[in-house]
């Protein structure tokens, strides 16, 4: 879950 996506 990388921080650039909506879930991370």
From Swiss-Prot:
GO cellular component: extracellular region
Location relative to the cell: Secreted
A Pfam family of this chain: Kinin
Keywords assigned by UniProt, alphabetized: Amidation, Neuropeptide, Secreted
GO BP terms, alphabetized: neuropeptide signaling pathway
Source superkingdom: Eukaryota
Predominant location: secreted
Glycine amide sites (modified residues): 8
Family that this chain belongs to: Belongs to the kinin family.
Reported function: Mediates visceral muscle contractile activity (myotropic activity).
Protein name: Kinin-1
Species name: Periplaneta americana (American cockroach)
């Amino acid at each position: 879950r990388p921080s650039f996506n909506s879930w991370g």
